[in-house]
Amino acid sequence: MDAKIGQFFDSVGTFFSGSDKIPWCDGDVIAGCEREVREATDSGTEDLKKECLMRLSWALVHSRQTEDVQRGIAMLEASLESSAPPLEDREKLYLLAVGYYRSGNYSRSRQLVDRCIEMQADWRQALVLKKTIEDKITKDGVIGIGITATAFGAVGLIAGGIVAAMSRKK
């Protein structure tokens, strides 16, 4: 019983804290990936450069910094324009979905993750991301309803107070 109560409070805490199962990336990792891209550009093969760019894209869309996430989205969208093997496109679509999720564009993120699932129905990462997106949309909806209800309640109280004050004056 105590375990169930603990789970309940953990889920409530997670609901209000906004935590999810998608990893974060810090500036040091991004700087390291940028250095790898420079080195691969200077002295590596084209395949090594592509691999380093994918790692950098991953790091950028997993960043806590909005400008990094936007940069990662732009890099991935530009790289999708060139023809690539389906597996590589699937990875890029997934990373784009993460980037759009991180930037708050949940509908675009869900569209992209759905495309990933169409490509591979049992892809666990994509399925977890889809659930995370849906949970976030639900949570935002519940919070929005709460804010709206609170606003209507406040307006009702003010209107009731005015009516009560006017009826006392008569």
Curated annotation (Swiss-Prot):
* SUPFAM superfamilies, alphabetized: TPR-like
Q: Which domain of life is it from?
A: Eukaryota
Broad class of the protein's primary localization: mitochondrion
Q: What happens when the gene is disrupted?
A: Reduced plant growth. Increase in the size of mitochondria and decrease in the number of mitochondria per cell.
GO terms, biological process:
mitochondrial fission; mitochondrion organization; peroxisome fission
UniProt keywords (A-Z) are:
Membrane, Mitochondrion, Mitochondrion outer membrane, Peroxisome, Peroxisome biogenesis, TPR repeat, Transmembrane, Transmembrane helix
Topology in membrane: Single-pass membrane protein
Intracellular or extracellular location(s): Mitochondrion outer membrane; Peroxisome membrane
Quaternary structure, per UniProt, is:
Interacts with ARC5.
Q: What does this protein do?
A: Component of the peroxisomal and mitochondrial division machineries. Plays a role in promoting the fission of mitochondria and peroxisomes.
Query: What is the UniProt domain comment for this protein?
Result: The C-terminus is necessary for mitochondrial or peroxisomal targeting, while the N-terminus is necessary for mitochondrial or peroxisomal fission.
**Other facts noted in the record for this chain:** Overexpression of FIS1A increases the fission of peroxisomes and mitochondria.
Give the PANTHER family listed for this entry.
MITOCHONDRIAL FISSION 1 PROTEIN, TETRATRICOPEPTIDE REPEAT PROTEIN 11 TPR REPEAT PROTEIN 11
Q: Which family does it belong to?
A: Belongs to the FIS1 family.
The identity of this protein, by name, is Mitochondrial fission 1 protein A
Q: Which gene encodes it?
A: FIS1A
